[in-house]
């Protein structure tokens, strides 16, 4: 006997959030179609943190750490920018594992994307494989139908529409009636990404030192006067070193254009960090290319849901990278959606459950959004947090911040919210996979 197909759900955007949401919803028993405007034939990106607040779901969902090249965080050190001398190494009690009991991993963004795509579409496993429609540009939304309109003019209806279309979201306008204003930080407004092969480093005796003991080692080098920083950690089974260079650039008129495809001359970038240890600059020079990510943020929005349509990921809470929680918060959205929509039936029921999703997710995502943005714009302050937290709840120290971000189970929070809505609510045995 065939199981019920559940709801017909459309997800717009097949990035990390969209694919994680598709995985969560297929496990909840629904039929999922993703519409992605690109061909996804040349995925790009640098590395990404996969912290405990989401690795706790990805592992039981089938994440094979070795297959996808994830690297377990082993050590975090702060080095002097001009000498590379170690100033401080976090003790075991201050690591993600020590504080939460769960691991933090480093992954190449392409590998995480590939893993989530496999989870969402694999023939075996709980639920029905999600279907991805590439080169399908969505040009209009109707949250009340709900439906989407493709560039071809085709209108596609569903029980639920989820806008996971990223930082340049059009879906958000359908929810709140206007575009979300983008803002440039007052400080640290530019991020350069380098991916340096470990083999290239090893081939030069002058740079081999960077490979020594580098398994799972994250290194942070901050120049305190200007706030420039360099962060490095390995990914793809320790075969690639990911470097993030943060700088403030006041005279660039094109800073609001977020373009991962734009390439920049490495010597020109390194001149901006010329006071850093020459050995580090030599390591960076081994990168085949470098990409710039203009750091642009948005303030929290106060509505994610309208009718039978909602938002997830950067579409509703784009944030700066200083807490390395952007991707993780999108995955938390995905898990919450899988929980609240499990067993949904009628239109009225769906709308109420999407409101529960908003209540579960909006406060937490907004807090992390503000905390992330505080790292680069001093006009974003504690005052912004007071809308969401009392004074005694605010995470001021690094310890408190890590506990707040990492030691959190969104599935449990969403489950408790659903139990208040419907005391008979149950999660299917396959959903968490634990």
UniProtKB/Swiss-Prot annotation:
Signal peptide: 1-22
Enzyme class: oxidoreductase
Summary of subunit composition and partner proteins: Monomer.
Pfam family for this entry, one: NAD_binding_8
Gene Ontology biological-process annotations: flavonoid biosynthetic process
Gene3D superfamilies found in the cross-reference section: FAD/NAD(P)-binding domain
Entry keyword annotation includes Ribosomal protein: no
Molecular function terms, GO-annotated: FAD binding; monooxygenase activity
Knockout-associated phenotype: Impairs the hydroxylation of the flavonoid skeleton at position C8.
Biochemical pathway: Secondary metabolite biosynthesis; flavonoid biosynthesis
Enzyme Commission code(s) on record: 1.-.-.-
Cofactor(s) listed: FAD
Function in brief: Monooxygenase; part of the gene cluster that mediates the biosynthesis of chlorflavonin, a fungal flavonoid with acetolactate synthase inhibitory activity. Within the pathway, cfoG is responsible for the hydroxylation of the flavonoid skeleton at position C8. The pathway begins with the PKS-NRPS hybrid synthetase cfoA that uses benzoic acid or p-hydroxybenzoic acid as a starter unit with four rounds of chain elongation using malonyl-CoA to form the chalcone skeleton.
UniProt protein name: FAD-dependent monooxygenase cfoG
Binding-site residues, FAD: 36, 314, 327
Domain of life: Eukaryota
Native source organism of the sequence: Aspergillus candidus
Active site (catalytic residues): 193, 233
Protein keywords: FAD, Flavonoid biosynthesis, Flavoprotein, Monooxygenase, Oxidoreductase, Signal
